[in-house]
A protein has these predicted regions:
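Short, well-ordered alpha-helices that flank and scaffold nucleotide-derived cofactor binding pockets
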Residues: 3, 90, 94, 192
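A conserved short coil-to-beta-strand element within the FAD-binding core of flavoproteins
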Residues: 16-21, 203-216
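A short, glycine/Asx- and small/polar-enriched loop/turn
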Residues: 26-31, 182-186, 211-217
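Phosphate-coordination loops involved in phosphoryl transfer and adenosine-cofactor binding
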Residues: 72-75, 171-173, 204, 217
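Residue-level recognition of phosphate/Mg2+-coordinating polar/acidic sites
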Residues: 40, 94, 164
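Conserved N-terminal/central alpha/beta ligand/cofactor-binding core
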Residues: 28, 110, 116-201, 205-206
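Extreme N-terminal leader/targeting segments of oxidoreductases
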Residues: 2-74
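N-terminal Rossmann-like FAD-binding beta1-loop-alpha1 element of flavoenzymes
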Residues: 71-106
Length: 218
């Protein structure tokens, strides 16, 4: 990529694979690599505009959200430690909100034992099974990641997975795949980060109802 653009290596801050896909439209399948280059001096980008017809300039999309200016009286509560709850709690924890997470099922190791027991005996634990417990239903999948191209949340989730031990190629493969064993370790690691940042996770704790007074949570 640097050679095609005639970019000296010392001017590149980063150069790597951004995406790998397969083009099978014309008979024999062809691997198509999309490369991403970040220059140390962004002001020099325009100088390489005509180096190749395949070159385009883009600004990476990153997930961001606005933070209010009123202090919270209580910690935010996240219900469930499935994929949505896990990343909601992670984002809140990284933003300094010390979330309280309520999960009706057990932590991952106990949950795995309960599922193995069910597979052997047929005895179902209503709170520790393939649906409920740390990691949610995805914990017992094979770790395939469904992407939403162009959604900045993709980068946030992918970066979190990479920071917690996922293979580097999930950042650029067309159909990224983590694998069950690695996925479970990643989930534990994310939970540990949430706790380290002041969050709290309460397992075997089900939300059974909400108390409403004057049209608001009491």
């Amino acid at each position: 990529a640097l050679h095609i653009l005639r970019v000296p290596a010392h001017k590149a801050a980063r150069c790597g694979v951004a995406k790998l896909s397969v083009d099978a439209r014309h008979g024999k399948p062809v691997l198509v690599y999309t490369m991403a280059i970040t220059l140390k001096d962004e002001g020099e980008e325009s100088a390489y505009a005509g180096a190749s017809p395949c070159v385009c300039f883009t600004q990476p999309t990153r997930f961001s959200f606005s933070v209010g200016d009123t202090a919270l009286k209580t910690r935010p509560v996240v219900v469930g430690l499935g994929p949505a709850g896990l990343f909601a709690a992670l984002l809140l924890a990284r933003s300094g909100f010390r979330p309280l997470v309520l999960e009706r099922g057990p932590e991952l190791d106990e949950r795995v034992k309960a599922v193995e027991h069910f597979e052997k005996t047929g005895e179902l634990n209503l709170n520790a099974n393939i649906q409920f417990g740390e990691g949610g239903a995805g914990t017992f999948s094979d770790g395939k990641l469904t992407t939403r191209v162009g959604d900045p949340l993709c980068a946030f989730v992918t970066d979190a997975f990479l920071q917690h031990g996922a293979p580097a190629d999930i950042a650029w493969r067309q159909k990224p795949h983590v694998g069950t064993d690695l996925l479970r370790g990643i989930i534990r690691s994310i939970r540990q980060e949430i706790i380290a940042l002041g969050g709290e996770v309460r397992f075997n704790t089900a939300l059974t109802g909400l108390k409403i007074e004057n049209g608001a949570l009491a």
